[in-house]
A protein has these predicted regions:
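Short intrinsically disordered terminal tails
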Residues: 1, 68-71
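N-terminal acidic leader/helix
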Residues: 1-29
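Short runs of predominantly hydrophobic/aromatic residues within well-ordered alpha helices
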Residues: 2-5, 9, 35, 55, ...
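Charged, amphipathic alpha-helical oligomerization/scaffolding segments
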Residues: 8-11, 15, 37, 44, ...
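Short, surface-exposed loop/turn segments at secondary-structure junctions
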Residues: 24-32, 52-56
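Amphipathic, non-membrane alpha-helical rod segments
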Residues: 30-49
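Short, charged early-sequence alpha-helical segments and their helix-coil boundaries
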Residues: 46-68
Length: 71
């Protein structure tokens, strides 16, 4: 599978971040519902990209950043 990294970084990541912000406002950033959504959606997107290492590492960075924000 050839991956369009430009599309991934310019569309997929920003769209996911926007949905993440919306979800955190809906259910609360610290809620189990939010974190389940985070893990589920990250997993789904990574699978769409056949768990490509750059994709999974990027989402790993985002997940770690979110955890730090949560305190």
């Amino acid at each position: 599978m050839r991956i369009d990294y430009i599309d991934f970084f310019s569309r997929v990541i920003p769209e996911w971040m926007a949905r993440s912000n919306q979800k955190s406002q809906e259910v609360g950033f610290g809620s189990d519902t939010y974190w389940l959504w985070v893990v589920t959606t990250i997993g789904e997107i990574c699978k769409q990209y056949n768990d490509d290492s750059l994709v999974t590492e990027q989402f790993g960075l985002l997940f770690n950043w979110l955890e730090k924000q949560a305190g």
